[in-house]
């Protein structure tokens, strides 16, 4: 029997609709939620991501500004722009699109964003707060994954969860959110000897590596929930995830597709973080 799909597009639409209502209420009070997106350079993928984020804002009643800069922008100039955005009362969230050109220190730039406007959740203050269970903002992709699990009313308390991938953006915060929900969590990284030995016992698998067909049917327990964060291209140039979708869907209980799974949820949770920042600022 095939796994049930967790439809990220449908869930994102529902959450965005609710966010638009909250945004309209704030706007009526003179506090329209505002997101500033900063793009440095001409990376094609980054341009697509940025365009999608700006459109999502505009479609749901948010104010958005897009600052595009050439790849030779100096680090000092970028930091000065972030400082100006930190002090702009119409901007509640600041997002610097990664990757940045090599001559710019990404860590320094992310740390320059005011924690109360760090809607990506990457600032060390927010990362630390996530560890203690009281974050201002949850990183958007893990937050979206948790919403997907919530949408199927999955009982995480006591469940065995395996996160494949240990990045600061997805893997580590994902593990923390699962831990806080009561799951017993294992993180697999590039040094893990036998990933399948861990995933075969898992009730929930989150694959976030960026390697096509990393998770195959023989690595999945029947009935498990499989969340695919990966974004890759197959031999025909079609988008695919880290999971062998055709094979794994015959074993899993629930599975997210690529595209149409985690991707739409990431941008949706960016809107939610921006909305919450605006609500806090409005009082």
Curated annotation (Swiss-Prot):
Pathway terms, separated by semicolons: One-carbon metabolism; tetrahydrofolate interconversion
Q: Which reaction does this enzyme catalyse, per its entry?
A: (6R)-5,10-methylene-5,6,7,8-tetrahydrofolate + NADP(+) = (6R)-5,10-methenyltetrahydrofolate + NADPH; (6R)-5,10-methenyltetrahydrofolate + H2O = (6R)-10-formyltetrahydrofolate + H(+)
Keyword check for NADP: yes
CC per GO annotation = cytosol
Instruction: Report the EC code(s) recorded for this entry.
Output: 1.5.1.5, 3.5.4.9
Q: Which UniProt keywords apply?
A: Amino-acid biosynthesis, Histidine biosynthesis, Hydrolase, Methionine biosynthesis, Multifunctional enzyme, NADP, One-carbon metabolism, Oxidoreductase, Purine biosynthesis
Q: Which GO terms describe its molecular function?
A: methenyltetrahydrofolate cyclohydrolase activity; methylenetetrahydrofolate dehydrogenase (NADP+) activity
Biological process annotations from GO: L-histidine biosynthetic process; methionine biosynthetic process; purine nucleotide biosynthetic process; tetrahydrofolate interconversion
Summarize where NADP(+) binds, as residue positions.
165-167, 190
One Pfam entry for this protein is THF_DHG_CYH
Give the InterPro entries listed for this entry: Aminoacid_DH-like_N_sf (IPR046346), NAD(P)-bd_dom_sf (IPR036291), THF_DH/CycHdrlase (IPR000672), THF_DH/CycHdrlase_cat_dom (IPR020630), THF_DH/CycHdrlase_CS (IPR020867), THF_DH/CycHdrlase_NAD-bd_dom (IPR020631)
Q: Which residues form a coiled coil?
A: none
NCBIfam families membership = PRK10792.1, PRK14186.1, PRK14189.1
Q: Which family does it belong to?
A: Belongs to the tetrahydrofolate dehydrogenase/cyclohydrolase family.
Oligomeric state and interaction partners are given as: Homodimer.
Function field: Catalyzes the oxidation of 5,10-methylenetetrahydrofolate to 5,10-methenyltetrahydrofolate and then the hydrolysis of 5,10-methenyltetrahydrofolate to 10-formyltetrahydrofolate.
Q: List the protein's name.
A: Bifunctional protein FolD
Its organism's taxonomic lineage begins at: Bacteria, Pseudomonadati, Pseudomonadota, Betaproteobacteria, Burkholderiales
| Gene field | folD
